[in-house]
Amino acid sequence: MSIIVKNLTHIYNEGMPFASKALDDVSFEIKDRDFVGLIGHTGSGKSTLIQHLNGLLKPSSGEIFINDFNITDKNLNLTEIRKRVGVVFQYPEYQLFEETIDKDIAFGPSNLGLEESEIHNRVKASMEAVGLDYEGFKDKSPFELSGGQKRRVAIAGVIAMNPEVLILDEPTAGLDPGGRDEIFNLIKDLHEKKNMTIILSSHSMDDMAKLAKTLIVMNHGSVEFMGTPREVFKSNASKLKDIGLDIPQVLELALKLREKGFDISEDILTLEEAKQEILKVVRGRGLC
């Protein structure tokens, strides 16, 4: 599904003494089946933007189009949009409540009025999609699982609704490095195998550089930069630091080496690219 955001502004407590503008004239377009990384410092407007994309918040002004649906139209029934646009919020495991994993994942599809056989098929398929064996996990309590496994169950509950767009707000928050890598690999697989449009909010610049096809950088409620990871990081490294954001570690290394006089390209995002550049410099100096 394509998403078009036009001149979106959101003011909390509008008209009140403590009014606060969280989004300021935001505009962008996301193509069908894109993988978008949404980055920005705390308070940049990322979470507020996410809540607009399936109608959880209404804008103060502006429009959002999901395919041909203007979801800011007051006369539009948002139920159909929310079936198509799934949102996984921060710490989604806190939303788990059923006594078994099977029942928890089935909760959403059950509210769609589906046949029991279809609900079963969706639960089984979504568990397998997130790497949980159905027979091995279906009767377990979600509260017996590790943090990473709980996160997988929560994501499966959204996938079971068969959304065309999956939005994830800091899905690895609070996980150890192993759990974080598992979730990022899962999201990558969902994008590749299910052809979903993915919008991923994260503070991990290294993972964003590897996963996302498009980056949207938010700053004080506005879109600061938008482009491919290579375009955004290569052209705006110093500006990103100025607004409180990191850059990928391999690019940081390249910039440090350039400061020391090494002729290292700034167009580096992966470890393999960094290795090749360093080898080129070493060989050029006759060191190997």
UniProtKB/Swiss-Prot annotation:
<dbReference type="InterPro" id="IPR030946">
    <property type="entry name" value="EcfA2"/>
</dbReference>
<dbReference type="InterPro" id="IPR003439">
    <property type="entry name" value="ABC_transporter-like_ATP-bd"/>
</dbReference>
<dbReference type="GO" id="GO:0042626">
    <property type="term" value="F:ATPase-coupled transmembrane transporter activity"/>
</dbReference>
<comment type="subunit">
    <text>Forms a stable energy-coupling factor (ECF) transporter complex composed of 2 membrane-embedded substrate-binding proteins (S component), 2 ATP-binding proteins (A component) and 2 transmembrane proteins (T component).</text>
</comment>
<feature type="binding site">
    <location>
        <begin position="40"/>
        <end position="47"/>
    </location>
    <ligand>
        <name>ATP</name>
    </ligand>
</feature>
<keyword id="KW-0547">Nucleotide-binding</keyword>
<dbReference type="GO" id="GO:0043190">
    <property type="term" value="C:ATP-binding cassette (ABC) transporter complex"/>
</dbReference>
<keyword id="KW-0472">Membrane</keyword>
<dbReference type="Pfam" id="PF00005">
    <property type="entry name" value="ABC_tran"/>
</dbReference>
<comment type="function">
    <text>ATP-binding (A) component of a common energy-coupling factor (ECF) ABC-transporter complex. Unlike classic ABC transporters this ECF transporter provides the energy necessary to transport a number of different substrates.</text>
</comment>
<feature type="domain" description="ABC transporter">
    <location>
        <begin position="3"/>
        <end position="245"/>
    </location>
</feature>
<dbReference type="InterPro" id="IPR050095">
    <property type="entry name" value="ECF_ABC_transporter_ATP-bd"/>
</dbReference>
<keyword id="KW-0067">ATP-binding</keyword>
<dbReference type="InterPro" id="IPR027417">
    <property type="entry name" value="P-loop_NTPase"/>
</dbReference>
<dbReference type="GO" id="GO:0005524">
    <property type="term" value="F:ATP binding"/>
</dbReference>
<comment type="similarity">
    <text>Belongs to the ABC transporter superfamily. Energy-coupling factor EcfA family.</text>
</comment>
<keyword id="KW-1003">Cell membrane</keyword>
<protein>
    <recommendedName>
        <fullName>Energy-coupling factor transporter ATP-binding protein EcfA2</fullName>
        <ecNumber>7.-.-.-</ecNumber>
    </recommendedName>
</protein>
<dbReference type="InterPro" id="IPR015856">
    <property type="entry name" value="ABC_transpr_CbiO/EcfA_su"/>
</dbReference>
<keyword id="KW-1278">Translocase</keyword>
<dbReference type="GO" id="GO:0016887">
    <property type="term" value="F:ATP hydrolysis activity"/>
</dbReference>
<dbReference type="InterPro" id="IPR003593">
    <property type="entry name" value="AAA+_ATPase"/>
</dbReference>
<dbReference type="InterPro" id="IPR017871">
    <property type="entry name" value="ABC_transporter-like_CS"/>
</dbReference>
<keyword id="KW-0813">Transport</keyword>
